UniProtKB/Swiss-Prot annotation:
It comes from the Bacteria. This is Adenosine deaminase. Catalyzes the deamination of adenosine into inosine. Is also able to deaminate adenine, but with considerably less efficiency. Is not active toward 6-chloroadenine. Zn(2+) binds at H65, H67, H207, D314. Belongs to the metallo-dependent hydrolases superfamily. It catalyses: adenosine + H2O + H(+) = inosine + NH4(+).
Amino acid sequence: MQEIIGASLVFLCNEKCEVLEDYGVVFDEKIVEIGDYQSLTLKYPHLKAQFFENSVLLPAFINAHTHFEFSNNKASFDYGSFSGWLGSVLNNGGAILENCQGAIQNAISTQLKSGVGSVGAISNHLIEVNLLKESPLNAVVFLEFLGSSYSLEKLKAFEAKFKELKDLEDKKLKAALAVHAPYSVQKDMALSVIQLAKDSQSLLSTHFLESLEELEWVENSKGWFENFYQHFLKESHFKSLYKGANDYIDMFKDTHTLFVHNQFASLEALKRIKSQVKNAFLITCPFSNRLLSGQALDLERTKEAGLSVSVATDGLSSNISLSLLDELRAFLLTHNMPLLELAKIALLGATRHGAKALALNNGEIEANKRADLSVFGFNEKFTKEQAILQFLLHAKEVECLFLGGKRVI
């Protein structure tokens, strides 16, 4: 059933990041037409129509990287350094996974209330999959592989679990694969997972150069990770699993891959990602990055490399909120560039670029895009010039949310 909604401000979230006044959208499951609200109501007088005063209409957000499995965490993990955090995850992570269904349900609710319609969910145990299927969210679930030594048995078990996930696919849930990180996945195992992604035409995700410790290890087999392998894995004289960052990047040639974090990636490494990986996308999680490494992604460097950036929350293992609105505000405070310019980067990072990263037909208000739309109400109208920044600063909870044309809030 087609209907029309309009608002005093409409963010198209297209390449130009256009802001339109008093515009509207005709939609059913997909967007049919965009235009001046009054003109649309005259053209389609038979359709239900609603206009939202002092409101912003925009695409539903895409949170392209989160870990629902850690939604139970409050203060079980150590912050202030990547090494301290990783050690605490290995020591305490098992307890966090226990009885986490309620916390995951709350996390899904937080996504929806903050205007998120699609998520990229990293999963080791598939605990969240049924809850995602029952929710209105569109989900790309990345089954994640970890293993620092070769094990055919482990690989076969992983392939069987991926088949289980593939069997659960439907219109709004897609299966994908993740190679955890350069310090945690042996090369032959990583190549097998990447080949599985190619064979199944699945997206890939990987954490990449999130810390100085990881960079030192990958490039020189030195630093904190020497003790890490001895202490946690009981392996001495362990060397980096790769011959540098480029060796890791090159495995992902001819794939669609999300590279997550990347704060310690050089311009050369980013350019190599751009040139070697068929469809490469960068994901930044500013709150997590501040808690763990203290370093933000270099946006000038990513721009020079020609790579788009999506903004995501990561999980509650390294965040205090799964609201993407909170994350976008953290993004604004993390980067030193003119605020109006940065606000546009943030908005597109949570919409257009996130949709492209997850290969979804949404993230923009454009004809034939899926009608994933949100409306946020405010007490006053923003000026057109300040609208995106003021929206990001003041938005707290969505007023209404349409996913696939159906109102879910």
